Amino acid sequence: MPPLLLLSALIFLVNVLGGAPGHNPNRRAKMISIHSLSELERLKLQEAAYHELVARQFLSEFKPERALPTDRSNTFEKWFLILRGQERAVSLKTFGIRLEEVLVNELTRRKQVELRATMQMQEAAGPATSGRRRGNAVQRMFGRIRRIFSGRRDEPFLPREFTRRGRRGAVSADSLAELEGGALLLQTLQLSRISFPIGQRLLGSKRKMSLNPIAKQIPHVVEACCSFIEKHGLSTVGIFTLEYSEKRVRKLREEFDQGLDVVLDDSQNVHDVAALLKEFFRDMKDSLLPDDLYMSFLQTATLKPQDQLSALQLLVYLMPPCHSDTLERLLKVLHKVAENCEDSIGIDGQLVSGNRMTSTNLALVFGSALLKKGASAKRESRKTRLGIDHYVASVSVVRAMIDNWDVLFQVPPHIQKQVAKRVWKSSPEALDFIRRRNLRKIQSERIKMEEDALLSDPVETSAEARAAILGQSKPFDEGSSEEPAVPPGTARSHDDEEGAGNPLILEQDRPLLRVPREKEAKTGIGYFFP
């Protein structure tokens, strides 16, 4: 009898808690964006991708280094830069440095602007109060430095109230330029946590991971240039290849290096902005596609198209978030340029000339800028062991990434299952929290879509429309199977309650190749019910 009672109790708990990952007969998984994943899920995604690539023998040249117990990122140096005065602003460059340094410099400049604005407000308040407040500011600065040395390694140096707000909702921003206030501190913290080499994030690192999605980490110069090209350069013939003004490009580059508020408007030349974007990636100290994965990316050129895309997906998962986010932004604009390569008929019926820049032409331009040889690759000959020329392989890889940019940054259902199982093994409570939060988000989105559909559908009378919108056309019966009408904000207003609701109805699994996901990525919803 005791074994039977134990088995019955286990079955009851499984039914109540929703079961372990991989057992979910009532729901179907779908492709999700990597931007909807929490920091913990991103780490588990990297682990799953690493083991999958090792099994496929794509990481033969990759030698991960284990993290030492004393390993920590240069958080002190980053914070000390933020606390420095205006005299060091000129040293915070944008071009010719590592991608992570570009992001940190942008954060530092933003913080300096905030500090200068605060000091000006204090000086305007009066000399008596400004002297006292200046002394308090100095005390706060030394207090921060003291906490950096004496605090625990994994403890975030953030105000308690801001940390609580950060746990309740994720930071969501299209670029670093859109982050406001305390989000700058959280962004710096996330940047310091992910700045380890790929191997150290996978092997031996015991840092605590957040359950919030990672804010997108895209340099301002990349976002500004890509937005300008999308608005003004899609129909420009020979974009990225024709001549440009070196003087104007040098001036723009100096303005970005000086941290000025550069605005790219109609007065700018498209070819100058395109050349500036190329120079940023060409002069970057590291490679946008990490040096450690150089040979692995080249090896994908020997595969069939579908197998190549699957391998490229895994390699993208393995990249640091700042690299993958910047790569996605670049591939998105390059894909739009390639879509406008041929002549077309505009809305007004006039002929619109194409830019003549196919994905192959764009890959020829950006292949060597995105795939740079690392220390290990430089020792190799011009051809890999498989007999493929490095340049030809790089063009093939970049072309495939441009053509399928919207698929590379999605997670297919079978990878979702692996990630969910790894999260379950490390922390069942974390997986339960992520499930409940994602369920509330999806329910809110579904309710909003239903209300939008009701508003868009024609109705016979205004009374019927009002009743349909308010959910009063038919009273809700407690014994019926229908849902009561829920206001749009209801699911978000009960963050501390249990995630309850009707079963989620998801779309059918979609194919791997050429999946449009523009609308789906904007929702930022990750859902792990494999």
Curated annotation (Swiss-Prot):
Keyword Signal: yes
Segments of this protein annotated with the region Disordered: 471-512
GO biological process: signal transduction
Highest taxon of the lineage: Eukaryota
InterPro entries, A to Z: ARHGAP6_RhoGAP, Rho_GTPase_activation_prot, RHOGAP6/36, RhoGAP_dom
Disulfide bond positions: none
Keywords: GTPase activation, Signal
Record flagged with keyword Lipid metabolism: no
Site (Arginine finger): 241
Annotated signal sequence range: 1-19
All residue ranges annotated as the Rho-GAP domain in the record: 209-409
Any one GO MF annotation of this record: GTPase activator activity
Gene3D superfamilies xref list: Rho GTPase activation protein (1.10.555.10)
UniProt-listed SUPFAM superfamilies: GTPase activation domain, GAP
Role, per record: GTPase activator for the Rho-type GTPases by converting them to an inactive GDP-bound state.
Record's subunit section: May interacts (via the Rho-GAP domain) with the active form of RAC1.
The protein, known as: Rho GTPase-activating protein 36
Species: Bos taurus
